[in-house]
Amino acid sequence: MKYTIVPAPRNLHDYVLELLEEWQPDCLDCEYSHGSPSPPTLHDLFDVELETSHSPFVGLCDSCAEADTDSSASTEADSGFSPLSTPPVSPIPPHPTSPASISDDMLLCLEEMPTFDDEDEVRSAATTFERWENTFDPHVGPIFGCLRCAFYQEQDDNALCGLCYLKALAEEPASAGAEEEDDEVIFVSAKPGGRKRSAATPCEPDGVSKRPCVPEPEQTEPLDLSLKPRPN
């Protein structure tokens, strides 16, 4: 392999200057003015040419806008209304300082208030019960001591008032069959079909009973539910 050795130039400075002149870019040749009055526009940067011809639609729109403003100004001048003036506020009617006069007829209540008796039953002043009570003779006819019940019986109604009905329910004796049912005791065993029903009998003496009553000893230890065989 052969190697060629380029002889070094005699003057290195002159050689570098020659290389710089050969490699000098084109942008260095353009002239730049440092004292420009205004920054460049987009048209200058992108080389966009403006159209010098005037569009006819622009003039038409301008003329229409001027005509509208002239017509609106003439109508406002005729009506005497200025656009900057605010509409007047409607006056608030003054309220009278003295209180309103209320007649006595307006304060009267035309409805009749109901009255309440001892049983808290609402009745008016002209009910049929009061008319019947005024003309009723308590010494004539079967009376159970209650005017309400007598009033219902006079009208051929087999009914009682609420208070007498509750008293009759409270005084009704209990049936004998219900007492016998209460005395029955039902024994239930663990075996299926081992349900036995018997009537409770008074306690028999210890000598007559087949099995003497032995008191159950008191449990002092906790109940063991495990499956382990218990020690003997």
Swiss-Prot record:
One of its GO terms (biological process) is symbiont-mediated perturbation of host cell cycle G1/S transition checkpoint. Keywords: Activator, Early protein, G1/S host cell cycle checkpoint dysregulation by virus, Host nucleus, Host-virus interaction, Inhibition of host innate immune response by virus, Inhibition of host interferon signaling pathway by virus, Inhibition of host STAT1 by virus, Interferon antiviral system evasion, Metal-binding, Modulation of host cell cycle by virus, Transcription, Transcription regulation, Viral immunoevasion, Zinc, Zinc-finger. A motif (LXCXE motif, interaction with host RB1) lies at residues 107-111. It is found in: Host nucleus. One of its GO terms (cellular component) is host cell nucleus. Interacts with host UBE2I; this interaction interferes with polySUMOylation. Interacts with host RB1; this interaction induces the aberrant dissociation of RB1-E2F1 complex thereby disrupting the activity of RB1 and activating E2F1-regulated genes. Interacts with host ATF7; the interaction enhances ATF7-mediated viral transactivation activity which requires the zinc binding domains of both proteins. Plays a role in viral genome replication by driving entry of quiescent cells into the cell cycle. Stimulation of progression from G1 to S phase allows the virus to efficiently use the cellular DNA replicating machinery to achieve viral genome replication. E1A protein has both transforming and trans-activating activities. Induces the disassembly of the E2F1 transcription factor from RB1 by direct competition for the same binding site on RB1, with subsequent transcriptional activation of E2F1-regulated S-phase genes and of the E2 region of the adenoviral genome. A zinc finger (unnamed) spans 146-164. This is Early E1A protein. Residues 40-48 are annotated as: Interaction with RB1 in competition with E2F1. A motif (PXDLS motif, CTBP-binding) lies at residues 222-226. Residues 69-84 have a biased composition (Low complexity). Residues 69-97, 175-232 are annotated as: Disordered. Residues 85-97 have a biased composition (Pro residues). A motif (Nuclear localization signal) lies at residues 228-232. It comes from Canine adenovirus serotype 2 (strain Toronto A 26-61). Belongs to the adenoviridae E1A protein family. GO terms for molecular function: zinc ion binding.
